[in-house]
Curated annotation (Swiss-Prot):
The keyword Transmembrane helix applies. The keyword Cytoplasm does not apply. Enriched in the animal hemisphere of the early cleavage embryo, where expression persists until the late gastrula stage. At the neurula stage, strongly expressed at the border of the neural plate and dorsal midline. After the neurula stage, expressed in various organs, including the eye, liver, heart, pronephros, otic vesicle, and dorsal neural tube. Expression in the developing eye is dynamic; expressed in the eye field from stages 23 to 27, and from stage 30 expression is confined to distinct regions including the central part and border of the eye. Required for a subset of Wnt-dependent developmental processes, in particular, eye and pronephros development. Regulates the secretion of wnt4, which is required for eye development. Its main location: Golgi. This is Protein wntless homolog B. Disulfide bonds: none annotated. One of its GO terms (biological process) is intracellular protein transport. GO terms for cellular component: cytoplasmic vesicle membrane; endomembrane system; Golgi membrane; organelle membrane. It holds the Pfam family WLS_GOLD. Belongs to the wntless family.
Length: 541
């Protein structure tokens, strides 16, 4: 009688496989913790206040804060007032990166936010619900001697969320407000070496444009991007893991197709999980180094969403197939109540992503976080997603408990057998329970990773620039997913061992009567493992 490798492999060999996987898991964490730098970094240049007295402010001239032809600048708005320079003639110019440095495609993306230094004045304070209007123009070039080329231009409105930490008195004039950062734009690729931002704050008293926004002293143009060193480590992991998963996936399915019976649902789902893991592994990001693929962020989110949906569905089906009787199992339609919400949630996440990153493919200045309603909806969406992830984990724990109880109940219904055979089944049950505990640990870390990434993205958009993601957590979780999928396909592949009347996997004998009784009890059910067949045995009361 043949089963899966997890049941027929000797304890010594199984322990060796487990130790090897554990060492690889530790290595995945160490790669991020000891080799890779932190995933993201940022530059924070202070914009130069340039003077532009041309009648047509929207002409093709670009104002540089430094270089061979720097703009004429002022130090403060008081100087502008003394020189009778109007606010409409002042342009905040910022160059990214700082001098003597270059941007690189290895940075993958660039998120730009503004940090305003606003001073309190009794005759010029920030009014409630004030909006700031930004006339933004962005240019790029790949050589310091080239002319600037326009990348994007738009007039955007952003809400000012500022708090004055002291009383509004004459004595506190000049004190700065505590303001949230203002999301400006997001680029899905960093394909050019130099970027130039020219930002104007147009004033129009008749239209109440930029009135009641306080006295702006300085503007910080903060650029957040992926660390190039982390990108190299990430690409290297993907390049190494992709062929490993493809090879084990082909080997697994070849063994399945060599069997006389057709594959059962559990085996198909394991194979589908391998496909989704391969989809997220394939390092197509290498092409983003040479091509300006601005859609890579959206494509990466879609790949990760497909894998999440497949992984969560697999855990539900994996537990369910070890709970149901043979008459109910092996049909995907049975799981519509559990898999349906996962599919619906994945579609909601896709729509949410398309509403921001999809629109940003045409308008990089668009952000759902720029309005009160949009920010509240986005934050509520993140909170609900986190709550749903926690509820899913609790439900999975309940299903695992049900599986354990079902296996124990079915085991008690087996006919009396020899001590050696009972020990054999005790060993199988122990191995299965250990795998289920590993599954729960995997699920817990996946939920934590999902919530962490969602909160982190919210912090980027809402202004918490002090957060530092742990590279070891990223590489460790990514390695864990691959090792888990690899282990499933290896351990649940059909074994080539067949045990006759005189042996078992531990070398223990069994009488022909006992073998006949056991065979008629559970082996008429198709399935990858003995425990799978045992769990689906129909009650004979």
């Amino acid at each position: 009688m043949a089963g899966a490798i997890i049941e027929n492999m000797s304890t010594k060999k199984l322990c060796m496989v487990g130790v090897a996987l554990l060492l690889l898991q530790v290595l995945a964490f160490l790669v991020g913790g000891l080799i890779a730098p932190k995933p993201t970094t940022y530059v924070n240049p202070v914009a130069m206040k340039c003077i532009d007295v041309r009648k047509s402010h929207r002409s093709s001239k670009w104002l540089m804060p430094w270089g061979t032809e720097p703009c004429k600048s002022i130090q403060s708005f008081d100087e502008a007032a003394n020189r009778l320079i109007e606010a409409n003639d002042i342009v905040f110019a910022a160059h990214i990166p700082n001098s003597q440095f270059e941007m690189s495609p290895w940075f993958q993306f660039m998120l730009v936010v503004l940090q305003l230094d606003i001073a309190f004045k009794l005759n010029n304070y920030i009014e409630d619900h004030s909006m700031v209007t930004l006339d933004v123009a962005v240019a790029y070039r790949d050589d310091l001697k080239e002319e600037w080329k326009e990348l994007a231009r738009s007039v955007e409105q952003r809400k000012l969320n500022c708090i004055l930490p002291v009383d509004k008195t004459v004595a506190n004039e000049g004190r700065h407000y505590d303001c949230d950062v203002i999301p400006l734009m997001e680029l899905g690729s960093v394909s050019h070496k130099y970027y130039l931002f020219n930002i104007r704050l147009p004033v129009n008293e008749r239209q109440k444009m930029n009135i009641g926004i306080g006295e702006i002293r300085d503007m910080h143009v903060v650029s957040i991007f992926q660390n190039g060193g982390f990108t190299m480590v990430w690409f290297a992991m993907k390049t190494f893991l992709t062929p490993c998963i493809i090879i084990i996936m082909i080997w697994y399915w070849r063994r399945i197709t060599m069997m006389t019976r057709s594959p059962v649902l559990l085996e198909k789902v394991i194979f589908a999980l391998g496909i989704s893991m391969t989809f997220i592994n394939i390092p197509v990001e290498w092409f983003s180094i040479g091509y300006d693929w601005t859609w890579m962020l959206l494509f990466g989110d879609i790949r990760q969403g497909i894998f999440y949906a497949m992984l969560l569905s697999f855990w539900i089906i994996f537990c369910g197939e070890h709970m149901m009787d043979q008459a109910e199992r092996n049909r995907i339609s049975i799981y519509w109540k559990q898999v349906g919400p996962i599919a619906f949630g994945s579609c909601c996440l896709f729509i949410f992503d398309m509403c921001e990153r999809g629109v940003q493919l045409k308008n990089p200045f668009y952000s759902i976080w720029t309005t009160d309603v949009g920010a509240e909806i986005a934050m509520a969406f993140i909170i609900v997603a986190g709550i749903c992830a926690c509820l899913y984990f609790l439900f999975l724990c309940f299903m695992v408990y049900q599986v354990f109880r079902n296996i124990s109940g079915k085991r008690s219904n087996l006919p009396a057998m020899s001590k050696a055979r009972r020990l054999h089944y005790e060993g199988l049950i122990f191995r299965f329970k250990f795998l289920m505990i590993i599954t729960l640990a995997c699920a817990a870390l996946t939920v934590v990773f999902f919530i962490t990434t969602q909160i982190t993205e919210g912090n980027w958009k809402l202004g918490d620039l002090s957060i530092e993601l742990n590279s070891a957590f990223f590489t460790g979780i990514y390695g864990m997913w691959n090792l888990y999928v690899f282990a499933l396909m290896f351990l649940y592949a059909p074994s080539h061992k067949h045990y006759g009347d005189g042996q078992s996997n531990d070398g223990a004998g069994m009488s022909s009567g006992e073998e006949l009784q056991l065979t008629t009890t559970i082996t008429h059910i198709d399935g990858p493992t003995e425990l799978y067949r045992l769990a689906g045995k129909e009650a004979q009361e």
